[in-house]
Amino acid sequence: MKRGWIPIMGVCLVLSFSACKQLLPYQDASLTAEQRAEDLLPRLTLEEKVSIMQNASPAIPRLGIKEYEWWNEALHGVGRAGLATVFPQSIGMGASFNDSLLYEVFNATSDEARVKSRIFGESGVLKRYQGLTFWTPNVNIFRDPRWGRGQETYGEDPYLTGQMGMAVVRGLQGPEDAGYDKLHACAKHFAVHSGPEWNRHSFDAENIDPRDLWETYLPAFKDLVQKAHVKEVMCAYN
């Protein structure tokens, strides 16, 4: 009689282990990113939500979430992550007035980025400059040549900046009907962040003329969000 119970117990153990391995909705790769996020967010405590609101997001072991470093750069090619194809600075690419060319540049950049991230990910943890979230493009308006980061922009023209910025986003993120994003682009810095750099943490931009704000500084961000569907937006420091 005792021997007869052994196979039954074995089957029960297999079934129980299978139940334990059943994926929760946020772990199910067959669901959309939106569905998985909607399932995951209510499972996070307030403290856990706060902890991941920074570029160095810690792991949440109880939910099987690994630590993640959001900071990565691709201003004119994959940056700070070993060998990569280096393209001209943004101000130079902007001078081409060729948004189709810019799309191809950042389509190639996102290809390299995915390969690099895949290799880096073999270690188990993606460190800074190894993930798939890139803080590019910079769609601020370059009005003052004394601003030390003007070379990151596409110049002083709001329309050109919007066109170039959208090409960058589409090249980095890939086709919207692909079912997944190649990576995430980030529109920065929202908004009126065009210098001075030395006092950026205290500079008061509230004295800007409302017409100048809406006609000069905001159109590119509107283009990237509403037309190119950029996945991230970085706030300004002012």
Q: What positions do the PLM features span?
A:
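Bacterial Sec-dependent N-terminal signal peptides
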Residues: M1-L24
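Glycoside hydrolase catalytic-domain context in secreted enzymes
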Residues: C20-N238
